[in-house]
Every structure is written in structure tokens, then in C-alpha cells.
């Protein structure tokens, strides 16, 4: 498929609605207007017109908007037809447009891809369109809009510009080694480098916040049967999401709930009780539980407080702790405090957090909610934030690593050439975020996840 083709797609969700929009972009958009509307509308004015079939009969009537390139979303000629939102009407109109030569259905995300290729958006802004559509909370939506308006890109471009100036200074020091002043050791380059590193650290902190807003944290509730895992899921979700009985092994599959705590998304996963099971279905559920545990950001180790007084996870169930992935954060949740009479609250035991609560009555659950929020390092008061994806975090981490390596070369051996190379690699990593240095394969993966009409 060529980017020279004219593309068309429905820009509104499928199904019935008050309004249905078809978007056309490309060189043939002008021809589509002449054939379907009988005229070319005045640029950027709403024109109420009939939409005509091949034989001149009306298929529908509605609003036509004409945006001649390059002053359009894609940078190409764009025509939008806003008609009635019935699927049959829209399908007839779409088929009519596709009878014209050189016009085809758009691929997912192709409108945004063309906007990127025509320098109307950088890659981070294009991704923010999808993030804005997928936002699951008000704060995520606001942060996605900030990214779309260029907040994230501006921070990255500032770093790239600072690296460019630093590279010029370093290259000059390399090219003129006979100067009386040793530019590499006079402290100026080190000071500038430290400034860039500090700025990058600040961006990484904000990006981690943005990633939390977009991705959320995956929390798995695990423990023995009848410890109260499903009751805790229901308490956190605020609804009866899981069946709760006194029968051990009631939960046999993975149950997922998506919740928010002060705008922070959490993926709460209830799992089958862990034990040696003879039942084949339960055994499969237990294996799935372990798969979820291995991919978790945090495990809530659910303990029935009526069965043990132990508080150290290694004392409660050493085999379970031994099987957990290394460095996986654990929060011990001693349940049934309404029966044991334990004091509700949170404490620390050998480096692990311990929460005492009653999932059945809900007492102490707010303490757990606050603990989960704090464990993520989420700052609800951070203003002007932006959303970030995992690839953004990786690119920022790679840039930080190159800068640290460059600093080591500067201070350890005054190796200007090696410093210059590390600065170049850091700049390249940062430029991957906005798409200045990005492979075609990555572009394909990013835009293929978009809606068809975007």
C-alpha cells in the first residue's frame, strides 16, 4: 500500500448514532468532493449538501467540511462527510466513495501516520491521540491531552537541544587539541553534562508517573484457599465481582478488576487458592495463578489470621516465598481481624509491609488502598504531567546510561572521542521518542494499534 493513495474510513464508532463521519485524505479527496457533493466546499466552512450516488440520486444529506493541504490534520487534502449515523447509510456512502479510482480503505492509524510523516505531529504526539481515546480516568485524559499538545515532546526536545550544544563544545575541544586551554578538563563540559543529567532525571521521574497513569500497576492477590482473597477483591472493587463461599477452592480461574485510587489505575487480580490439588480444573487454575504472580508488580499475600499468629511471610509459608520471583514486592495481608481482634493498620516486618484488615466488613481496606498508592510512588499533586509508554521509559533509561558512561569517560580518562560518541547515542535514544530516529517496523507496530479512522 502506498502513501500516495487516497484513503477513506469511518471516523465515528460503528453502530447506530446521531451522526456518522467519513474521513477522506489524499490527492483524490478533491475528486471525491466533486463526485459525491457536486462541488468543492469552501475551505474550513460547514456546507449542508446532499451526498450523491453514482446515478445522481441522494444517499444522504449532511455537513461537508473541506480542509485543503497542508493546513489539515494529515497535511494532505482532507474531506469530512458528516451524515446520519445509521450503519447502512454509512456503508452505502463508503461503497460509493470506493468506486472512485485511487481510493482505498485506510489501515488502522493511517491518518495519524500520515500526520506524522508530513510533520504535523511528532511520534509522541501521535501516540497521545490513542492514549487520549483509551484514557480510563480524568487525570489520564488530561495528561494525554498535555502530551498531544506537545508537553512531553517539548521536554525531550529541550534535552536534545542541550545535548547538541554540548556535542558542539566537545567536538571543538577534540578538533583543536593544541589550544592553550584544555576544554575537556576546565570543568565547563562537566558542569553542562551534569545539568543535562539532572534535567533528564526530572523528565524520567515525570515519565514514570505518566506510565503509571497509562499502564497502571498489576496487583495479584495470592494465598491459600479460603484466606479471603475474593472478599478482598470485592472490597477493593466496591462490588460483588467474585463469588464468595466457605468452600475451599471456590475460585478456580483468574478474576480481573480494573479500579482507580485517586486517579491511579490498578489491575487487581484474584487467583485460585494455592495448594496441591487433585482436581484437574483447580490444578489448571493454580498454574494460571502462578503465571499471574510471576508477571505482577506487587503481590498481596493473603493470610487467614485465624490459622496462624505469624507475621513474617517466611514463617507463614516458606515454600510460597521461596517460589516467588526475586525482588517482587510483597504485602502481607492478615485477614479476618474482625474475628481475631487484631489492631487494624499497617506495619513493617523484616522489610515487608503488613496490613491487618477485615475483607468481609471492609475495616482496614482504606489503609491497604493508601498503601498501594504510596507503593507506586504516585504523586496526585503533580501538575502539567504527560502520559508515557514503556518504550519512552526505555529510551530515557538508555539515554541516561549513555550520559553516565560519557561522564565516566570524561572524568576517568578525559577521552573526548568516547564522550562524544556516548553523547551521540544518548541524543539518538531521545530522538526515538519523537520519531526523529525510528525504524519502520516500530512505526508499523505503533500505528497499527490505532482506530481505523485515526
From Swiss-Prot:
Q: How is the cofactor bound?
A: Binds 1 potassium ion per subunit.
- Chief place of localization: cytoplasm
EC number from the UniProt entry: 3.6.-.-
Quaternary structure (record): Homodimer. Heterotetramer of two MnmE and two MnmG subunits.
Summarize the protein's role.
Exhibits a very high intrinsic GTPase hydrolysis rate. Involved in the addition of a carboxymethylaminomethyl (cmnm) group at the wobble position (U34) of certain tRNAs, forming tRNA-cmnm(5)s(2)U34.
PANTHER family, A to Z: TRNA MODIFICATION GTPASE GTPBP3, TRNA MODIFICATION GTPASE GTPBP3, MITOCHONDRIAL
Q: What is this protein called in UniProt?
A: tRNA modification GTPase MnmE
> What organism is recorded for this protein?
Salmonella paratyphi C (strain RKS4594)
Amino acid at each position: 500500500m502506498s502513501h500516495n493513495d487516497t484513503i477513506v474510513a469511518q471516523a465515528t464508532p460503528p453502530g447506530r448514532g446521531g451522526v456518522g463521519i467519513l474521513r477522506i485524505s489524499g490527492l483524490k479527496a478533491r475528486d471525491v468532493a466533486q463526485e459525491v457533493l457536486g462541488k468543492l466546499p469552501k475551505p474550513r466552512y460547514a456546507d449542508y449538501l446532499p451526498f450523491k450516488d453514482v446515478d445522481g440520486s441522494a444517499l444522504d444529506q449532511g455537513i461537508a467540511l473541506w480542509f485543503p493541504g497542508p493546513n489539515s490534520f494529515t497535511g494532505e487534502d482532507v474531506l469530512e462527510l458528516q451524515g446520519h449515523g445509521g450503519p447502512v447509510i454509512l456503508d452505502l456512502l463508503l461503497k460509493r466513495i470506493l468506486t472512485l479510482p485511487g481510493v482505498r480503505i485506510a489501515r488502522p492509524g493511517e491518518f495519524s501516520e500520515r500526520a506524522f510523516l508530513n510533520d504535523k505531529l511528532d511520534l509522541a504526539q501521535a501516540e497521545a491521540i490513542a492514549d487520549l481515546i483509551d484514557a480510563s480516568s480524568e487525570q489520564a485524559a488530561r495528561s494525554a491531552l498535555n502530551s498531544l499538545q506537545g508537553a512531553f515532546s517539548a521536554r525531550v526536545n529541550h534535552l536534545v537541544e542541550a545535548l547538541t550544544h554540548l556535542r558542539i563544545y566537545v567536538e571543538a575541544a577534540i578538533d583543536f587539541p593544541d589550544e592553550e586551554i584544555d576544554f575537556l578538563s576546565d570543568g565547563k563540559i562537566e558542569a553542562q553534562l551534569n545539568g543535562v543529567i539532572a534535567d533528564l532525571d526530572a523528565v524520567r521521574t515525570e515519565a514514570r508517573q505518566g506510565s503509571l497513569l497509562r499502564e497502571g500497576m498489576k496487583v495479584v492477590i495470592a494465598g491459600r484457599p479460603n484466606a479471603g482473597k475474593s472478599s478482598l477483591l470485592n472490597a477493593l472493587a466496591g462490588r460483588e465481582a467474585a463469588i464468595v463461599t466457605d468452600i475451599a477452592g471456590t475460585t478456580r480461574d483468574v478474576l480481573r478488576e480494573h479500579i482507580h485510587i485517586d486517579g491511579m489505575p490498578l489491575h487487581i487480580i484474584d487467583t485460585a487458592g494455592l495448594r496441591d490439588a487433585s482436581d484437574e480444573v483447580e490444578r489448571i487454575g493454580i498454574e494460571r495463578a502462578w503465571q499471574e504472580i510471576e508477571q505482577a508488580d506487587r503481590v498481596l499475600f493473603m493470610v487467614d489470621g485465624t490459622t496462624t499468629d505469624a507475621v513474617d511471610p517466611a514463617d507463614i509459608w516458606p515454600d510460597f516465598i521461596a517460589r516467588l520471583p526475586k525482588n517482587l514486592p510483597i504485602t502481607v495481608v492478615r485477614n479476618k481481624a474482625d474475628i481475631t481482634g487484631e489492631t487494624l493498620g499497617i506495619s513493617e516486618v523484616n522489610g515487608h509491609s503488613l496490613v491487618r484488615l477485615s475483607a468481609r466488613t471492609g475495616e482496614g481496606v482504606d489503609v491497604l488502598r493508601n498503601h498501594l498508592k504510596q507503593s507506586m510512588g504516585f504523586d496526585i499533586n503533580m501538575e502539567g504531567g504527560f502520559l508515557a509508554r514503556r518504550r519512552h521509559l526505555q529510551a530515557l533509561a538508555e539515554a541516561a546510561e549513555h550520559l553516565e558512561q560519557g561522564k565516566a569517560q570524561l572524568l576517568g580518562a578525559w577521552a573526548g572521542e568516547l564522550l562524544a560518541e556516548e553523547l551521540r547515542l544518548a541524543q539518538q535514544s531521545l530522538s526515538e521518542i519523537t520519531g526523529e530516529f525510528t525504524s519502520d517496523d516500530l512505526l508499523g507496530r505503533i500505528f497499527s494499534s490505532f482506530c481505523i479512522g485515526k
